[in-house]
């Protein structure tokens, strides 16, 4: 088995690495334009850190043990680790912290999914110590700017509100509340209709089920519900957020308001969202995020809560959707120069000349011919590798230059 990676792992070959680096580099450039600074957290964390007080299912965490039998895990996402670092290492700075990252994450696949991928690559941002709709708007506008920088089209932002979604389920008896939540989140209308509910609650459940669509329409409908003061305030804030977004960009964000949206990780307290792209007759979740105003308090030494909001973008899905894009590199960048010794005793001069070329332009790629190939083989290699210049070096160090 040593000739293969383990089930769930995969190698990335140079062209795929170059393409994903192009995606990452463009995203990081946009993040930095918005004032975000890169942070790097540990791949290994205490298991308690990664589960975020139970908000992250520990069965999704790939676990390890120290020699002292202490439980560690490979991070299944970055937000918990960044929250921990922010409140323990940057606690003196309670003004807004703009942090970004590019990293790998690890997750156990669902049971019965042997061989499914366990390592994933993400890029994202976290805006910490910042509450309110202005911070929410910044994150959503940054997300749109990031996707535009990649030349992505046909994407939609599916946006919900975690606290409002939970409050809409309050009228249901506790024994069936989670089942209703599951049916609504998974678009299971038949399952919802078969639940043992009285007619009024069943009609209410179906009303909730249909709370997806154009933001203004959905907010008008939910405003007709018998909402408590907190839910009414959330609806008012959503209206203000959409008005702010509409007036802040020339290109309107393609938003679908879905008040039944539920995220994988259960630490969200405010807006939650997914970015979905439609390509090759399939839908891809390009990213997800939301507001988490109680997560930082789990790691703060004095348990002080601080607000936060962020998103992550899934590099594999972005790569898949961009494969037909003319912007994505379709071949590896070839070396500009191949330096060849005309005789075996000219090898020292070859290394000297190659280094002179590199020092003249730090961006130039220069290869040295290692010997053993005929001139015909050298020319064939240079053409197949998109090398544009050859330098034939004799024992005196004199170059003979060719352009292909």
Swiss-Prot record:
InterPro entries: aa-tRNA-synth_II/BPL/LPL (IPR045864), HisRS-like_core (IPR041715), HisRS/HisZ (IPR004516), HisZ (IPR004517). The keyword Cytoplasm applies. Required for the first step of histidine biosynthesis. May allow the feedback regulation of ATP phosphoribosyltransferase activity by histidine. Pathway: Amino-acid biosynthesis; L-histidine biosynthesis; L-histidine from 5-phospho-alpha-D-ribose 1-diphosphate: step 1/9. This function is generally fulfilled by the C-terminal part of HisG, which is missing in some bacteria such as this one. It is found in: Cytoplasm. One of its GO terms (cellular component) is cytoplasm. Belongs to the class-II aminoacyl-tRNA synthetase family. HisZ subfamily. Heteromultimer composed of HisG and HisZ subunits. It holds the Pfam family tRNA-synt_His. One of its GO terms (biological process) is L-histidine biosynthetic process. SUPFAM superfamilies: Class II aaRS and biotin synthetases. The keyword Cytoplasm applies. Keywords: Amino-acid biosynthesis, Cytoplasm, Histidine biosynthesis. It comes from the Bacteria. GO terms for molecular function: histidine-tRNA ligase activity. This is ATP phosphoribosyltransferase regulatory subunit.
């Amino acid at each position: 088995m040593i000739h293969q990676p383990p089930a769930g792992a995969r190698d990335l070959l140079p062209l795929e690495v170059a393409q994903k680096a192009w995606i990452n580099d463009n995203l990081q450039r946009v993040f930095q334009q918005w004032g975000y600074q890169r942070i790097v957290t540990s791949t290994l964390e205490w298991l308690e850190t990664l589960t975020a007080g139970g908000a992250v299912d520990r069965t999704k965490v790939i676990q390890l043990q120290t020699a002292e039998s202490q439980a560690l895990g490979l991070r299944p996402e970055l937000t918990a680790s960044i929250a921990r670092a922010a409140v323990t290492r940057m606690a003196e700075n309670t003004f807004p912290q703009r942090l970004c990252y590019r990293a790998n994450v690890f997750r156990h696949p669902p049971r019965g999914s042997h061989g499914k991928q366990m390592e994933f690559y993400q890029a994202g941002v976290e805006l910490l110590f910042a509450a309110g709709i202005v911070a929410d708007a910044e994150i959503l506008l940054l997300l749109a700017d990031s996707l535009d920088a990649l030349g992505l089209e046909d994407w939609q932002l599916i946006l919900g509100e975690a606290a409002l979604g939970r409050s809409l389920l309050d009228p249901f008896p506790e024994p069936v509340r989670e089942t209703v939540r599951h049916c609504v989140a998974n678009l299971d209308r038949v399952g919802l209709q078969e639940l043992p509910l009285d007619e009024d609650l069943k009609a209410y459940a179906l009303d909730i089920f249909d709370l997806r669509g154009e933001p203004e329409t959905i907010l008008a409908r939910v405003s007709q519900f018998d909402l408590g003061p907190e839910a009414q305030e959330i609806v008012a804030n959503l209206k203000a957020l959409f008005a702010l977004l509409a007036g802040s960009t020339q290109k309107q964000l393609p938003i679908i308001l879905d008040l039944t949206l539920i995220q994988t990780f259960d630490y969200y307290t405010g807006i939650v969202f997914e970015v979905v792209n439609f390509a090759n007759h399939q839908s891809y979740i390009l990213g997800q995020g939301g507001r988490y105003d109680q997560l930082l308090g789990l790691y703060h030494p004095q348990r002080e809560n601080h607000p936060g909001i962020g998103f992550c973008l899934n590099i594999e899905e972005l790569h898949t959707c961009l494969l037909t894009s003319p912007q994505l590199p379709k071949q590896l960048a070839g070396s500009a120069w191949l330096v060849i010794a005309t005789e075996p005793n000219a090898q020292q001069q070859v290394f000297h000349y190659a280094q002179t070329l590199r020092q003249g332009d730090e961006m130039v790629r220069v290869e040295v011919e290692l010997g053993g190939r005929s001139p015909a083989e050298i020319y064939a290699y240079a053409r197949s590798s998109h090398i544009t210049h050859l330098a034939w070096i004799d024992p005196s160090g004199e170059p003979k230059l060719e352009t292909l």
